[in-house]
Regions:
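Intrinsically disordered, low-complexity regions enriched in acidic/Ser/Thr/Pro/Gln residues
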Residues: 1-155, 160-162
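Short, solvent-exposed amphipathic alpha-helical segments in soluble enzyme
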Residues: 44-45, 54-55, 168-170, 178-181, ...
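Short beta->alpha linker loops
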Residues: 167, 196-197, 218-219, 238-241
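Extracellular/luminal Protease-associated
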Residues: 182-219, 227
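C-terminal binding/interaction regions
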Residues: 222-253
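Extended, folded domain segments that form the structural surfaces/walls around functional sites
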Residues: 104, 118, 122-133, 169-182, ...
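General beta-strand structural signal in soluble alpha/beta enzymes
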Residues: 162-163, 193, 214-215, 234-237
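Glycine- and Gly-Pro-enriched alpha-helical subdomains that act as flexible
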Residues: 142-191, 195
Length: 253
């Protein structure tokens, strides 16, 4: 965070005050000596962000595929050596996402519908989601101070991975990146995200085979279609004691 002296106007009264503003940096990822992408992101958990981004973009199958990862915070560059499983020609098919920070993905999220079908078996009581979301939306100290970040969390029996970033997709990649390195069982996790759920958010969740995604906000039509085709549980507007179930209601008992 960085503090600025600003003028606050409330009910016609002007006041000079200090205001905390969230930080934004351009992180350029260099993969095996070639510049891959520049992510506009918050300057924290950058190694987790890189690991999660490479995984959800399909460049690798596990964290151990990375043989070297260093982040230069003076130049805001991440240098990655990795055993890549992605066809090189797809590098020219960048898709700019709808999320904050002008994110990039290297596949069409609609293609996920043709490849992933989640198994049944994982269930949770509806009341549990209300408790999870209540704690989730009050967990971000950065949001409390700046109002300028999104959050994502992975919740399972082993605990919670919680991350902030100015972009929803970045926050999710950070959580996934840490989960990969801790080798958590993604198939037994619930993913939480703040704000709108678009197709690329659902695609990242399905890449990990996570069965449940819940948000305090709304999904897009493509997010709902992908979730239904993949048998994923998608919850929106989880607030107070209510929620909308857009797909996969069989997992809520």
């Amino acid at each position: 965070m960085e503090n600025f002296v600003i003028t606050s106007i409330r009910q016609g009264v002007r006041e000079e005050k200090s205001d905390a503003v969230t930080e934004e940096v351009p992180l350029t990822i260099e993969l095996n000596g070639t510049e891959l992408a520049t992510l506009l992101c918050s300057p924290s958990d950058l190694k987790n962000l890189v690991v999660g981004f490479l995984y959800t973009s399909g460049f690798m199958e596990e964290a151990s595929s990375i043989t070297s990862l260093t982040v230069d915070q003076d130049r805001w560059k991440a240098y990655v050596d990795c055993v890549v499983t992605f066809p090189s020609e797809v590098l020219f098919k960048r898709i700019y996402t709808s999320g904050c920070g002008k994110g990039i993905i290297f596949h069409n999220p609609l293609d996920v519908m043709q490849r992933v079908r989640l198994a049944d078996g994982f269930t949770l009581a509806g009341e549990q989601f209300f408790g999870m979301m209540k704690k989730f939306i009050t967990s971000s100290e950065e949001f409390r101070l700046t109002g300028g970040v999104h959050s994502a969390a992975l919740i399972g029996d082993a605990g919670t991975i919680f991350k902030d970033d100015l972009g929803r997709h970045n926050a999710l990649d950070k959580a996934i990146g840490e989960g990969l390195q801790k080798k958590i069982d993604f198939s037994a996790q619930v993913a939480l995200t703040s704000g709108r759920v678009s197709s690329e958010i659902v695609a990242k969740i399905l890449r990990c085979q996570i069965p449940v995604l819940a948000s305090s906000g709304a999904p897009t039509n493509q997010a709902v279609k992908i979730a239904r085709e993949a048998n994923m549980t998608l919850l929106g507007f989880v607030r107070g004691q209510r929620m909308n179930v857009y797909s996969g209601e069989q997992r809520i008992v």
